[in-house]
């Protein structure tokens, strides 16, 4: 049928592109995402990336610093959402008829204009750039952490349980600022370009004045999420 070649080197910013093929009166199109090659992501002096609020992270928060808590896949306790099977695809038929067959969720909702997602092109719903994040994550029952905090990225729960679930949210701990991620940003990152771009987007956000959590929670509440 032929081939298509396109040089991506001139694309300097993250972008969602559309390839459309037209033959006579028939057309089809496909979305794909291009992310510039990033240098290895390392913790800046201003932000600590961790999977648990240990003494170093707690000291950072108490001194007014910034911490990105990224939960490792499989470490979220069941009572906080660890028993919910998140899926990129939605529930098949319904979980009552399938005896709780996975997945237990119905995609995500987010504000595409939220500054945390600025260098991560997205619609308000999940698309294929979210596949990696959702397959390396757990949905957090945010109402058990804070009654006031709102998700940056919301996971839609099964309509039978309808728990408020978050993939990303932010809170204030003492003088410090904490971004909590149900997405695992630790494992196999060299093989996950979409995850690297999303992490870069979050770190850029945390380094900006837009990152200003208002709702206060206790350190013990956050650490209770994790099954160590």
Where are these regions (language model features)?
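Edge beta-strands of extracellular beta-sandwich domains
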Residues: 26-38
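Short amphipathic C-terminal alpha-helix that caps PH/PH-like domains
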Residues: 194-207
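Intrinsically disordered, low-complexity Pro/Gly/Ser/Thr-rich segments with frequent PxxP/GP/PP motifs
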Residues: 1-14
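Residues that act as N-cap/strand-start positions at coil-to-secondary-structure junctions
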Residues: 26, 53, 163-165
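Catalytic beta-strand/loop cores that center a nucleophilic Ser/Cys/Thr
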Residues: 14, 76-77, 94-193, 211-228
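Short, aromatic- and glycine-rich surface loops/edge beta-strands on solvent-exposed regions
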Residues: 12-25
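Short, charged low-complexity linker/loop segments at the C-terminal edge of domains
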Residues: 38-42, 207-215
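Short alpha-beta junction capping motif
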Residues: 44-94, 172-177, 181, 202
